[in-house]
Amino acid sequence: MPTVNPQQLADRIDTVLDILVAGDYHSAIHNLEILKAELLAQSQQNDEPGEKKQKAPWEI
């Protein structure tokens, strides 16, 4: 069962922030979408079937 490495996650977020500071919004969004997909894939490996997910409070 794979786990999230906090240091690797922080490094990837730093990379996205650097891309945003450089003004390349398209690449930053693309990198966030890749990261999200990878995290969701890991999360789905641990989910119970039929378990309902609640949205985070900051999601619209």
Swiss-Prot record:
Regions that span the bilayer: none
Signal peptide: none
InterPro entries on file: UPF0509
Family affiliation: Belongs to the UPF0509 family.
Protein name: UPF0509 protein ESA_01586
Annotated source species: Cronobacter sakazakii (strain ATCC BAA-894) (Enterobacter sakazakii)
Lineage: Bacteria, Pseudomonadati, Pseudomonadota, Gammaproteobacteria, Enterobacterales
